[in-house]
Amino acid sequence: MSRKCQLTGKKANNAYAVSHSHRRTKKLQEANLQWKRVWWPEGNRWVRLRLSTKAIKTLETKGLSVMAKEAGINLNKI
């Protein structure tokens, strides 16, 4: 599985690591992803998702069903 948030689609960003002498080397800024078990009331079961920490905070306000619908995810297949 790729390092990508399953609800928001967040993934790594290409950036430069800049030294004191201003030499630049490429680096990846990875998203802060966590495995999270979320209760899905409509399905009456737990769903295990790989989410960014921003998505976890948004999930608490919006709810799982609304966010999954916005992302176009069928929770029955997960």
Swiss-Prot record:
Keywords: Ribonucleoprotein, Ribosomal protein
Gene Ontology cellular component list: ribonucleoprotein complex; ribosome
Gene Ontology biological process terms from the UniProt entry: translation
Superkingdom classification of source: Bacteria
MF (Gene Ontology): structural constituent of ribosome
Record bears the keyword Metal-binding: no
NCBIfam families in the cross-refs: L28
Family assignment from sequence similarity: Belongs to the bacterial ribosomal protein bL28 family.
Protein name stated in the entry: Large ribosomal subunit protein bL28
Organism, as annotated: Rippkaea orientalis (strain PCC 8801 / RF-1) (Cyanothece sp. (strain PCC 8801))
